[in-house]
């Protein structure tokens, strides 16, 4: 019997309406003589500028999205009808999670499927309760004596939810020489579970480091002819990026399509996952329309032609940072800030002169609207748009929560612009910083700290003085995901930047500081990413100074960094894969299935 239609809104073709012409290839930065004529009117300023002078250009790819179509589309308002259906399905799944008679491994696999399918946020307290019962009843000790799969799965789930479990759980699967037993490689499911568990390691956990090497070496030896198409897809998916570092929505859509192929799939769980995915997608569409209207109203993309117009990519990034449906304010805030960051980064990196950049930095530090009188005309529009947007965000927070957050927002922007300015000085002076000097500035110029400051005030309901103090200091909760953001970004762009002779990049600075090859420097940067993840894992286990929703948001920023920069710079140069991902998360619903 066919199930009810779970598609809440019409699917949008990959090549129809939403896209403009295909994107051209990236062209290397070249100097040009630009005659710029801008005529801009806002409520507070109007100007006309004509200037002819040498300016650099990065020849960025143009925006490939049709904003008019986005603004004209309308989400199916019948979403309310589906909420009742979702509640009934949710109740059935909740009963399964809370079934105290369920076998340990059955329970663990159910929890794993719930989370992979994007439903974890619906069952947080139920999952925590089930894991509490699992531990208190001796479940962890029991599964470690029976199978590697059960041991690895329970280890990963427990660490993910803040339980302290020892890596020694894997000692029973090693021989007398301390090596993992060779016969384990015959159990592909167990090796996959071991691989995923190894990414929850802390600093100094050598057993898990060895487990990762062991699992990767055996998984890479497998072929589709040997293990079958379905299992090969799972292996390739895992090797591309481990589950712990994947963004939630992309993993959900992949897992739903993989799960529906299973003969023993839980149909109630699958139906809820599809319904939930499409319902949340309709929320994203509403959010995107709101943000798109703001972007059109601001008008920077049409006036500053030298800069990247990346609103859709910025919104997609924001979904990765805060995917839960209740965090619309966070998504809109982060998307707006990343759109500004992208354009202002191009001003500092490409277009502005050093004198102009110092003026702009001073204007942001002063946060005085009269500072626009000291700026060149193209900067006036940008500063005033930034000034009005941030003041509006601060006003809304004061109105809704009674907190004046403007000083914290403006400080974050001043810090970012100063970091941008330092990079511009290195470029203009043609100097190569040491790796430590570069990275001490670069993790801030990634914009990670700024985005997380804005995210904090959007997701945290009860703002605490201690949290504010640590927010301003860019506590480890903020700095470490920003480190990963910068390192992932630099890995994606290093080869191209080195070829152009640019010096300020993690890889190039590491090469010069250590006197090593690009290959070795790249490997070292990847190791830094792994070590940073171990520190973040430790903080999550040990408890954070910040509220849990913000901690998860910060970790998600690191995950989105992997997603965006894993196969190149998908923010600067979005390719076909990036566009497909954006569509799958934001516009294309998952079609219903047949029972």
From Swiss-Prot:
Protein's pathway: Terpene metabolism
Motif DDXXD motif in this chain: 345-349
Binding site for Mg(2+) 3: 489, 493, 497
Stretch forming the transit peptide: 1-37
GO molecular function: isoprene synthase activity; magnesium ion binding
Subcellular location: Plastid, Chloroplast
Biological function: Lyase that catalyzes the formation of isoprene from dimethylallyl diphosphate, but not from isopentenyl diphosphate or geranyl diphosphate.
Protein name: Isoprene synthase, chloroplastic
């Amino acid at each position: 019997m066919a199930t009810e239609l779970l598609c809440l809104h019409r699917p949008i073709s990959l090549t129809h309406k939403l896209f403009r012409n295909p994107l051209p290839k990236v062209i290397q930065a070249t100097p040009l003589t630009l005659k710029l004529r801008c005529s801009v009117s806002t409520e507070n300023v109007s100007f006309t500028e004509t200037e002819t002078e040498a300016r650099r250009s990065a020849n960025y790819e143009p925006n490939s999205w049709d904003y008019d179509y986005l603004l004209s589309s309308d989400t199916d308002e019948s979403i309310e009808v589906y909420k009742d259906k979702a509640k009934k399905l949710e109740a059935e799944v909740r009963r399964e999670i809370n079934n105290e008679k369920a076998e340990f491994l059955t329970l663990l696999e159910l929890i794993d499927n719930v989370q992979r399918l994007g439903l974890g946020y619906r069952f947080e307290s139920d999952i925590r309760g089930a894991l509490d019962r699992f531990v208190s009843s001796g479940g962890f000790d029991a599964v470690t004596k029976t199978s590697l799969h059960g041991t690895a799965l329970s280890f990963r789930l427990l660490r993910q939810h803040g339980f302290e479990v020892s890596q020694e759980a894997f000692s029973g699967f090693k021989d007398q020489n301390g090596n993992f037993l060779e016969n384990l490689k015959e159990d592909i499911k167990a090796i996959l579970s071991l691989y995923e568990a190894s990414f929850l390691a802390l600093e100094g956990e050598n057993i898990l480091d060895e487990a990762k090497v062991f699992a990767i070496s055996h998984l890479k030896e497998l072929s589709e002819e040997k293990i079958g198409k379905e299992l090969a897809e799972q292996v390739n998916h895992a090797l591309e990026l481990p589950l712990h570092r994947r963004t939630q929505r992309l993993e959900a859509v992949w897992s739903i399509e993989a799960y529906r192929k299973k003969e023993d799939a839980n149909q109630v769980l699958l139906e809820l996952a599809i319904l939930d995915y499409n319902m949340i997608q309709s929320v994203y569409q509403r959010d995107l329309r709101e943000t798109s209207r703001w972007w059109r109203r601001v008008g920077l993309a049409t006036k500053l032609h030298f800069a990247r117009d990346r609103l859709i990519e910025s919104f997609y990034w924001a979904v990765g940072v805060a995917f839960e449906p209740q965090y619309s304010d966070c998504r809109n805030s982060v998307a707006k800030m990343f759109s500004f960051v992208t354009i202002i980064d191009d001003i500092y990196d490409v277009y502005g002169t050093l004198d102009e950049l110092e003026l702009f930095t001073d204007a942001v530090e002063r946060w005085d609207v009269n500072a626009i009188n000291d700026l060149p005309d193209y900067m006036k529009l940008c500063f005033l748009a930034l000034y009005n947007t941030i003041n509006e965000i601060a006003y809304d927070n004061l109105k809704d929560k009674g907190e004046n957050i403007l000083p914290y927002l403006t400080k974050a922007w001043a810090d970012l612009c100063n970091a941008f300015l330092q990079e511009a000085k290195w470029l203009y002076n043609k100097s190569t910083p040491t790796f430590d000097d570069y990275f001490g500035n670069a993790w801030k110029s990634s914009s990670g700290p700024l985005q997380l400051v804005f995210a904090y005030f959007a997701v945290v309901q009860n703002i605490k003085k201690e949290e504010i103090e640590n927010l301003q200091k860019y506590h480890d909760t903020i700095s470490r995901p920003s480190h990963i953001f910068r390192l992932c970004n630099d890995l994606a762009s290093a080869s191209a930047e080195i070829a152009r002779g640019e010096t300020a990049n993690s890889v190039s600075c590491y090469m010069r500081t250590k006197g090593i090859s690009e290959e070795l420097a790249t490997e070292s940067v990847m190791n830094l990413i792994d070590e940073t993840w171990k520190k973040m894992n430790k903080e999550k286990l040990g408890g954070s100074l910040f509220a849990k929703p913000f901690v998860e948001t910060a970790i998600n920023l690191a995950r989105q960094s992997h997603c965006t920069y894993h196969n190149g710079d998908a923010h600067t140069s979005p390719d076909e894969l990036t566009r497909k991902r954006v569509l799958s998360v934001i516009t294309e619903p998952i079609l219903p299935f047949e029972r």
